[in-house]
Amino acid sequence: MSSERVLSYAPAFKSFLDTSFFQELSRLKLDVLKLDSTCQPLTVNLDLHNIPKSADQVPLFLTNRSFEKHNNKRTNEVPLQGSIFNFNVLDEFKNLDKQLFLHQRALECWEDGIKDINKCVSFVIISFADLKKYRFYYWLGVPCFQRPSSTVLHVRPEPSLKGLFSKCQKWFDVNYSKWVCILDADDEIVNYDKCIIRKTKVLAIRDTSTMENVPSALTKNFLSVLQYDVPDLIDFKLLIIRQNEGSFALNATFASIDPQSSSSNPDMKVSGWERNVQGKLAPRVVDLSSLLDPLKIADQSVDLNLKLMKWRILPDLNLDIIKNTKVLLLGAGTLGCYVSRALIAWGVRKITFVDNGTVSYSNPVRQALYNFEDCGKPKAELAAASLKRIFPLMDATGVKLSIPMIGHKLVNEEAQHKDFDRLRALIKEHDIIFLLVDSRESRWLPSLLSNIENKTVINAALGFDSYLVMRHGNRDEQSSKQLGCYFCHDVVAPTDSLTDRTLDQMCTVTRPGVAMMASSLAVELMTSLLQTKYSGSETTVLGDIPHQIRGFLHNFSILKLETPAYEHCPACSPKVIEAFTDLGWEFVKKALEHPLYLEEISGLSVIKQEVERLGNDVFEWEDDESDEIA
């Protein structure tokens, strides 16, 4: 090097942001920060011992652990505190006055540095995260400041200080959080002290540059603070310490005596924005959509819109309880298909279909999970496979099973007993049961079993231009109030409604939009219900939790109704529950073959007899009145 020159500087760091950094930023933005764009702390551990030979600066590696307050450092690593400002809108990021922003950060470093010279080093990242496209815009800045008077105009080599290099390196290894040290009157390396350096005039700085005889721009920060502490200092000795080879010593001269030694808000030049890969002073853009696992992207994207609800509209919405709910769909037809699509849109991950039918040629146009090639194949398995094609991380299962129906005589008792056992096991394994089958009698056994297992039931049923959506009231021993089930309005036990029906009665003849309306309301009722552990609560963060919703398309009206449980209900009355508890399958078998048996157990037969007696009394009274008139 020449005998005398103006001191020049190299960039402080070269940034490397790992994909895990952006993934953690995405998680924090969605789940924690939301609309908060204020400063968030970062921590980086610099490895100054293992710098690649091809690198001109120390790599600044940022990973998901950079967001941790206590980022565990390894031996000889140097901790560095920084921050990130993640903007909500791309235009905010673009229109930010970058120079003013960096100047403000430099003033913060200056204010920290005049209290402790080791605190005048930091870094900052400004960013915008496009979470839909997985594109991240960011720019790293390392605030490097220099007051006019602290410009080093003359530097000359000082070979006599080379013997201090190893001592300084060892001192920095022990004092890993320090960036500067000084030489005292006894030629010992000690912590920075402005009273001592005023006399010895020897300053050693830890360096992050690898360029020969060119220190990093961070040196300007330390020299500015040094001159503030010792305003009359002109000539001094400067040691640039690198943990590997390349340390050097200089005789240095400040441009002038500091005229602003008492100023805490000095006039200073600030630089530090990192250049991009093209060598331009501009932000960088990272597109992770092609780098991340598509399944990981799908998993996060499914929850994106749901989590955005919590940013502004519903901050108290509990999405985890919905996501972790295990749902059983009894019926994989029109209702089952639409309900399942609404469930996965709400983030439900576990769905089991139960159906014993196959896809007919009339189904694909109305049942959203099937297409023409599926005709003739089992519905339940196909529905589960279709959900997995839509979202591969779904835990979807299809079970081909015939639900034993009341009023239908046993054909194969062994097989139907197995179906009963399997159905009861499925109901036990799931949290919410949707009854989406196409006959009243097929709803009886699931209603009974769900009541026995105290499971929440959501019922959806269709008419030509009407629909019913209702939830069954769970048994609550602490409350005398219990809502009615699907059968609580019946005055007779369910019977065979499928035999001897014409074609228009066997097929589901409804206005096509009715199924979609009922399905969506059924799922929305479930999500509202899940927001509170008390099924009888009137409102949640999502609003009301009605018992029944009845819709009529002929005048486009909706009614919300509530009815209590009926003490003689053939599905949920205490006597029916008691009989099933005592007899199990034997009770079910008798009820299937002899509906009148169920009426006797529930007490409906007594009600029928009383009604008939009252009717006879009325007729006798009318006959007496006629005789008198005559």
From Swiss-Prot:
Outcome of residue 550 to A? Answer: Loss of interaction with ATG8
Outcome (variant: residue 507 to A): Loss of interaction with ATG8 and ATG12 and no more formation of ATG12-ATG5 conjugate. Defect in Cvt pathway and autophagy
A Pfam short name: ThiF
Find motif (GXGXXG motif) and give its ranges.
331-336
User: According to its UniProt record, where is this protein mainly located?
Assistant: cytoplasm
Q: Which UniProt keywords apply?
A: Autophagy, Cytoplasm, Protein transport, Transport, Ubl conjugation pathway
Kindly list the places in or outside the cell where this protein is found, as annotated in its UniProt entry: Cytoplasm; Preautophagosomal structure
| Region entry Homodimerization, spans | 591-630
Q: Spell out the molecular function terms from Gene Ontology.
A: Atg12 activating enzyme activity; Atg8 activating enzyme activity; identical protein binding
GO CC terms in record: cytoplasm; cytosol; extrinsic component of phagophore assembly site membrane; membrane; mitochondrion; phagophore assembly site
What family classification does the UniProt entry report for this protein? Answer: Belongs to the ATG7 family.
* Cross-referenced PANTHER family: UBIQUITIN-ACTIVATING ENZYME E1, UBIQUITIN-LIKE MODIFIER-ACTIVATING ENZYME ATG7
**Self-association and partners:** Homodimer; homodimerization is required for ATP-binding. Interacts with ATG8 through a thioester bond between Cys-507 and the C-terminal 'Gly-116' of ATG8 and with ATG12 through a thioester bond between Cys-507 and the C-terminal 'Gly-186' of ATG12. Also interacts with ATG3.
Relay the domain remarks: The C-terminal 40 residues are required for homodimerization, as well as the interactions with ATG3, ATG8 and ATG12; and the C-terminal 17 residues are required for the ATG8 lipidation. The GxGxxG motif is important for the function, possibly through binding with ATP.
- What is the protein's given name? Ubiquitin-like modifier-activating enzyme ATG7
The gene designation is ATG7
